């Protein structure tokens, strides 16, 4: 085996180990939640040392961020698939798609918002931008529904609406004391969007 072949073999093994570590971390988060995730458990499941995990991702935060990036990508893919022909139906579709994703991937989505960097380090800019891009998907339909509003106000309203939808869904799925009953989440989300838009003066279709 020449040097090029040996290097290629090492690269393949490295990629396989990285993929395995990500999959194990994702599976553990999905089943038990982020707070139960331990680097030792990931390393043991992958039959490697803790040092190998750190070498691959820099630190444990690096592994969690990698899983969270993939979660945002999957969420955004689902949201962008919502038809955009009618802005009101699009907003309802975005809320419905978010509910579906949250119900199917509750712990993974929760991990995205629960994760705190070690030593209060700032989050990498790329994942912040990815999350903001997902939130911004409500911006385009709101612009169409509120054409006379200040663009900066509409951008802020889009973030506020997405935050409200996220909060309603998160509390509802966790069945918190003040939450909307899970069985009525879809119905009451639709009512919230209609009521909120009416308060903003958006036309009814």
Give the positions of each predicted feature.
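N-terminal intrinsically disordered/low-complexity leader segments
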Residues: 1-16, 203-205
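Amphipathic alpha-helical segments used for helix-helix packing
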Residues: 103-125, 170-178
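Amphipathic alpha-helical linker/stalk segments
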Residues: 69-93, 123, 132-133, 138-142
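Amphipathic alpha-helical packing segments from all-alpha helical-bundle domains
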Residues: 121-147, 155-160, 183, 187-198
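Alpha-helical DNA-contacting segments of helix-turn-helix folds
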Residues: 29, 63-71, 79, 112, ...
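Hydrophobic alpha-helical connector segments
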Residues: 80-108, 148, 157-161
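Amphipathic C-terminal alpha-helical segment
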Residues: 162-180, 195-204
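Helix-turn-helix
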Residues: 20, 28-62, 66
């Amino acid at each position: 085996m020449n040097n090029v072949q040996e290097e290629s073999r090492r690269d393949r093994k490295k990629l396989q180990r990285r993929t395995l570590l990500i999959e194990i971390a994702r599976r553990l988060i999905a089943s038990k939640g982020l707070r139960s995730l331990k680097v030792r458990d990931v390393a043991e499941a992958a039959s490697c040392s803790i040092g190998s995990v750190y070498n691959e991702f820099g630190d444990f935060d690096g592994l969690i961020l990698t899983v969270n990036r993939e979660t945002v990508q999957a969420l955004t893919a689902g949201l962008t698939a919502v038809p955009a022909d009618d802005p009101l139906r699009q907003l309802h579709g975005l809320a419905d798609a978010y509910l579906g994703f949250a119900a199917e991937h509750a712990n993974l989505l929760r991990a995205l918002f629960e994760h705190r960097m070690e030593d209060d380090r700032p989050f990498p800019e790329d994942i912040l931008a990815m999350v903001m891009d997902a939130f911004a998907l409500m911006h385009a339909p709101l612009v169409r529904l509120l054409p006379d509003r200040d663009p900066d106000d509409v951008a802020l309203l889009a973030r506020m609406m997405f935050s409200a939808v996220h909060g309603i869904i998160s509390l509802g799925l966790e069945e918190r004391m003040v939450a909307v009953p899970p069985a009525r989440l879809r119905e009451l989300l639709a009512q919230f969007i209609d009521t909120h838009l009416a308060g903003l003066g958006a036309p009814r279709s």
